[in-house]
UniProtKB/Swiss-Prot annotation:
GO cellular component, one term: perineuronal net
Paired cysteines (S-S): C56-C136, C178-C249, C202-C223, C276-C351, C300-C321, C626-C637, C631-C646, C648-C657, C692-C784, C760-C776, C791-C834, C820-C847
Gene that specifies this protein: Bcan
Keywords noted in UniProt: Disulfide bond, EGF-like domain, Extracellular matrix, Glycoprotein, GPI-anchor, Hyaluronic acid, Immunoglobulin domain, Lectin, Lipoprotein, Membrane, Phosphoprotein, Proteoglycan, Repeat, Secreted, Signal, Sushi
Full protein name: Brevican core protein
Range of residues in the leader sequence: 1-22
Tissue: Brain.
GO molecular function ontology, one term from the record: carbohydrate binding
A Gene Ontology biological process term: synapse maturation
Stretches for region Disordered: 389-574, 859-883
Ranges of Acidic residues composition bias in the record: 441-451
Residue ranges of domain EGF-like in the record: 622-658
Subcellular location: Secreted
């Protein structure tokens, strides 16, 4: 028994010896150490864009050595550790300091070397990527010591817009929107700090100082940075408080608990609201979700939020969740980042419960990827270029299209679109069929080029890949801004055909576009317009009115002839005969050339034709009755002996031109004999002009100061006008043909800056609408203009055809030329003119068979007796009846 006890005692002594020996060695080491570095905190929190002091003090364990024993200053080194990276921030010895270039002007040792025991670091302009571990090391002689602390930078900047439209907030509305989602409007310093941390967003948004900016990491043709070709925060400067933009919001603290609710079958928006209320919570706001993501929340499950959006936070992205970048992902209906899912679709929900412990979120929720097969992001770049420095640039753009794919088909989907703002990246080769869930409609769409990039807090990363996409149920509609009545709804998609039926709805500042070769769109209750267009994506008009069916392709004008022999006319083949009108035939004919004679000139006194509205004669009480002009609607006042007379522009009549004889089409606005329609969709000058021509119009021409004020005040955007010098440098012409009778150039314009191809003209609305010449490939909004009176397609003749491609409408005084078919000879005048009453002149051309060469030689025979012509020649010169 005793030997057993002795052996156990010996074993116990042996096991305790190493620990005791280690403690003795540690105690001896501490006694030998001259000093110890202490930070005194396990974690520090800083605010985005602010400054943070990281304390670090040197505690001497024995009296410090004399200067003779340890000459010089201690060496101080601060190091940043994040993952596997270790970066020197600062190294200092006395007055000699070496700072890493990435931290230049941002770090300092405020007390050192005046105090050798205080080596605290101050880090300013905090960025999101400043979060990590900071290590403080001090070395003096042969002694050294170090300590570390974790730093967390809280606060996140994100772009916010409501689902109805882009650029919908005034400055006051932007502040209210951020407050409504549990955030506040960001400051310029916060946005700049987010940019320095890698944030990029190609959308112009309000900031707290009433400026409009957006951050760009990779300048490109779609989005420029601080300067031409350089990254930075693009700054529009201080703009008017009533201008409309998106807003950059800032969220910081989450004063409560945010958790994911994922019941079986998922929830509609109203069911999601009730789900949170039953658990003593409420639907989380967008700002709260961003704050939770900034605090570490990672959920690969789209869920409802209070504003009707569907989002999910990703910290660790993967191919099936988030693409390749972290951030809060948002599901949109349309490529221009608008349209939230229908509230009848089913998703999970993010709930928020107030708590006494801030910055807490539930980790005990259901699995992160419950029921989620994949999250696919489909993106197409929307091109937008900046304006030169003199004319503040146009709004920037982005394009993000996120579609969840679920097993039960209830996760929602979307209608693919082809953004007209990016015509330079055709992707017709990347097409595939879309597989719909059970019970939903079928659609054959076009898969856009994919980028693994979402709406928020990440840098774009392109990756071409095709995926199968679900289609949104037919109940979905495109949300419209407040005050707009009707909605667009999609129905069944037909098999491949050659037309796209499109429906116009109530006027929208940015009308949606439906893409696909065969999309059938149902018209909502009320009036609308229905147009048949060729295969391809076309813009849905926003006008309302009685239905109008047209079969003429809306294509660009092309040189060449188009036969009018076959096919019925779109208008009745009747016209009012008005007799022969002599028109000078151009010496050099050009196929498809339209000759305009200035119908858009309102103030120019032009003698009316027989069919024009002359107006009456009013008795003048005294001279000078034309100042101010009593004539309405752009009429010209002429003083006469017995009074004055008003010459009315086409479409108006009456003594004072106050009687409307013609009216603009639905969706077009009248002014002084012309109709105008504004498009907020950004296009290059050539694309905008082509779109206007497809509508039977042109980019607006400005012929009077009154017209300048109308266009600039009515449509308060940077916009193209029809003026250009694309043909001859310095020779500016209007695209619709009238002479240049009025100018409103900015000082120093046009300048064709360094011959950089500034051949098109933009109206800068905030500078009283003054004009500047800019490159034609900028993407701006535009206004189309057509005459109040116009003619339809020209009369069809069986043996003749019109030069050029027929159009839907022709302006008054447009002159067209017929030519006879091959083998026929032309007789009589081949020209017709569009009259002021909207009818074409009666064609006078006659086409007869050509005579053989022998018959032509006989025509040159000498005259017969008494000066008479040969009978055969006389018969040939007898004009035939009109064909």
């Amino acid at each position: 028994m005793i030997p057993l006890l002795l052996s156990l005692l010996a074993a116990l002594v042996l096991t305790q010896a190493p620990a005791a020996l280690a403690d003795d060695l540690k105690e001896d080491s501490s006694e030998d150490r001259a000093f110890r570095v202490r930070i005194g905190a396990a974690q520090l929190r800083g605010v985005l864009g602010g400054a943070l002091a990281i304390p670090c003090h040197v505690h001497h364990l024995r009296p410090p050595p004399s200067r003779r024993a340890a000459p010089g200053f201690p060496r101080v080194k601060w190091t940043f550790l994040s993952g596997d990276r270790e970066v020197e921030v600062l190294v200092a010895r006395g007055l000699r300091v070496k700072v890493n270039e990435a931290y230049r002007f941002r770090v300092a040792l405020p007390a050192y070397p005046a105090s050798l025991t205080d080596v605290s670091l101050v880090l300013s302009e905090l960025r999101p990527n400043d979060s990590g571990v900071y290590r403080c090391e001090v070395q003096h002689g042969i002694d050294d010591s170090s300590d570390a602390v974790e730093v967390k930078v809280k606060g996140v900047v994100f772009l916010y817009r409501e689902g109805s439209a882009r650029y919908a907030f005034s400055f006051a509305g932007a502040q209210e929107a951020c407050a409504r989602i549990g955030a506040r409007i960001a400051t310029p310093e916060q946005l700049y700090a987010a940019y320095l941390g890698g944030y990029e967003q190609c959308d112009a948004g309000w900031l707290s100082d009433q400026t409009v900016r957006y951050p760009i990491q990779n300048p490109r043709e779609a989005c420029y940075g601080d300067m031409d070709g350089y990254p930075g925060v693009r700054n529009y400067g201080v703009v008017g408080p009533d201008d409309l933009y998106d807003v950059y919001c800032y969220a910081e603290d989450l004063n409560g608990e945010l958790f994911l609710g994922a019941p079986p079958g998922k929830l509609t928006w109203e069911e999601a609201r009730d789900y949170c209320l039953e658990r003593g919570a409420q639907i989380a706001s967008t700002g709260q979700l961003y704050a939770a993501w900034n605090g570490g929340l990672d959920r690969c499950s789209p869920g409802w939020l209070a504003d009707g959006s569907v989002r999910y936070p990703i910290i660790t992205p993967s191919q099936r969740c988030g693409g390749g970048l972290p951030g809060v992902k948002t599901l949109f209906l349309f490529p221009n980042q608008t349209g939230f899912p229908s509230k009848q679709n089913r998703f999970n929900v993010y709930c928020f419960r107030d708590s006494a412990h801030p910055s807490a979120f539930s980790e005990a929720s259901s699995p992160a990827s419950d029921g989620l097969e994949a999250i696919v992001t489909v993106t197409e770049k929307l091109e937008e270029l900046q304006l030169p420095q003199e004319a503040v640039e146009s709004e920037s753009r982005g394009a993000i299209y996120s579609i969840p794919i679920t097993e039960d088909g209830g996760g929602g989907s979307s209608t693919p679109e082809d953004p007209a703002e990016a015509p330079r990246t055709p992707l017709e080769s990347e097409t595939q069929s879309v597989a719909p869930p059970t019970g939903s409609s079928e659609e054959e769409g076009e898969a856009l080029e994919e980028e693994e990039r979402f709406k928020d807090t990440e840098t774009p990363k392109e990756e071409k890949e095709q995926e199968n996409l679900w289609v949104w149920p037919t109940e979905l509609s495109s949300p419209l801004p407040t005050g707009l009545e009707t909605e667009h709804s999609l129905s069944q998609v037909s098999p491949p055909a050659q037309a796209v039926l499109q429906v116009g709805a109530s006027p929208s500042p940015r009308p949606p576009r439906v893409h696909g070769p065969t999309v059938e769109t149902l018209q909502p209750p009320g009036e609308g317009s229905l147009t048949s267009t060729p295969d391809g994506a076309r813009e849905v008009g926003g006008e309302t009115g009685s239905p109008e069916l047209s079969g003429v392709p809306r294509e660009r004008e092309e040189a060449g002839s188009s036969s009018l022999e076959d096919g019925p006319s779109l208008l009745p083949e009747t016209w009012a005969p008005v007799g022969t009108r002599e028109v000078e035939t151009p010496s050099e004919e050009k196929s498809g050339r339209t000759v305009l004679t200035g119908t858009s000139v309102q103030a120019q006194p032009v003698l009316p034709t027989d069919s024009a509205s002359r107006g009456g004669v009013a008795v003048a009480p005294s001279s000078g009755d034309c100042i101010p002009s009593p004539c309405h609607n752009g009429g010209t006042c002429l003083e006469e002996k017995e009074g004055f007379r008003c010459l009315c522009v086409p479409g108006y009549g009456g003594d004072l031109c106050d009687v409307g004889l013609h009216f603009c089409s639905p969706g077009w606005e009248p002014f002084q004999g012309a109709c105008y329609k504004h498009f907020s969709t950004r296009r290059s000058w050539e694309e905008a002009e082509s779109q206007c021509r497809a509508l039977g119009a042109h980019l607006t021409s400005i012929c009077t100061p009154e017209e300048q004020d109308f266009v600039n005040d009515r449509y308060r955007e940077y916009q193209w006008i029809g003026l250009n010098d694309r043909t001859i440098e310095g020779d500016f012409l209007w695209s619709d043909g009238p002479p240049l009778l009025y100018e409103n150039w900015n000082p120093g314009q046009p300048d064709s800056y360094f011959l950089s191809g500034e051949n098109c003209v933009v109206m800068v609305w905030h500078d009283q609408g003054q004009w500047s010449d800019v490159p034609c490939n900028y993407h701006l909004s535009y206004t189309c203009k057509m005459g109040l009176v116009s003619c339809g397609p020209p009369p069809q003749l069986p043996l003749a055809q019109i030069f050029g491609r027929p159009r839907l409408r022709y302006a008054v005084d447009t002159v067209l030329r017929y030519r006879c078919r091959d083998g026929l000879a032309q007789r009589n005048l081949p020209l017709i003119r569009c009259q002021e009453n909207g009818l074409w002149e009666a064609p006078q051309i006659s086409c007869v068979p050509r005579r053989p060469a022998r018959a032509l030689r006989s025509m040159t025979a000498p005259e017969g007796p008494r000066g008479q012509l040969p009978r055969q020649r006389k018969a040939l010169l007898t004009p035939p009846s009109s064909l």
